[in-house]
Amino acid sequence: MSRPHRIAAGGITFRGNAVLLVRYRNSNGGTYLVGPGGALRDDENVIQAIVRETKEETAVTVRPRRVVVIEDLVCSRFKMSKVWMICEVVEGEVRGTEEAEKEGIIEAAWYTRDQLANEVVFPAALIQHDWAQLRSEHWQVKCLPSRKANF
C-alpha cells in the first residue's frame, strides 16, 4: 500500500543524565515516548521545525546543534522520514502547554535511561545506543531501519 510521505524533525535534548521526551497515547490504548518534534511547515527548515515544536510541546526553547539520527517510520496514514538533532536548552522549564494538549500529549518530562526500560521510545537510538556516545562530537549519523509506528 502506498502512503503519503511526511518530512519531520525532532530534538534530542539532554539535561544531565536525562532526556526531554513527551508522552502520547497510541492507537492500541498504550503510550509511547518521543523527543519533541513534528512535521515541517512549508515555510521552515529542519532546525526551525525543531525549535518551534519543542517550544509548543514542552515550553522549552532549544538550539539544535547537529544531526545524529535519520528515522523512517511506517505510520497508519503516512510514511515519515524524521531528522533527529542533538539540542541544547536555551531557556525554559518543562510544563504542559495548550498546543501540547491539542496535539494529544499527555506528559512532558525529563527521563533517565533507567526510566525508559519498559517504554516504547522514538527514536530507537535512545534505547539502542550509549547516551555519552550519542552526545559526542565524534558520533556518526545513523540511518535507522524502517520501523512500524502505531500512530
Question: For the regions a protein language model found, what residue spans apply to each?
Answer:
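Conserved N-terminal beta-strand and adjoining loop/helix that marks the start
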Residues: 1-20, 39, 70
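Residue-level preference for beta-strand/loop junctions
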Residues: 3-5, 31, 79-81
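Structural detector for hydrophobic anchor residues on beta-strands
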Residues: 8-9, 33, 106
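Active-site beta-strand termini and strand-to-loop segments that position acidic
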Residues: 13-16, 24, 87-89
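Conserved Nudix-box catalytic region and its N-terminal flanking loop in Nudix hydrolases
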Residues: 18-56
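Unchanged
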Residues: 40-63, 73-125, 149-151
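Conserved S-adenosyl-L-methionine
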Residues: 65-69
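Charged phosphate-binding loop/patch that engages nucleotide di/tri-phosphates or the phosphate backbone
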Residues: 128-151
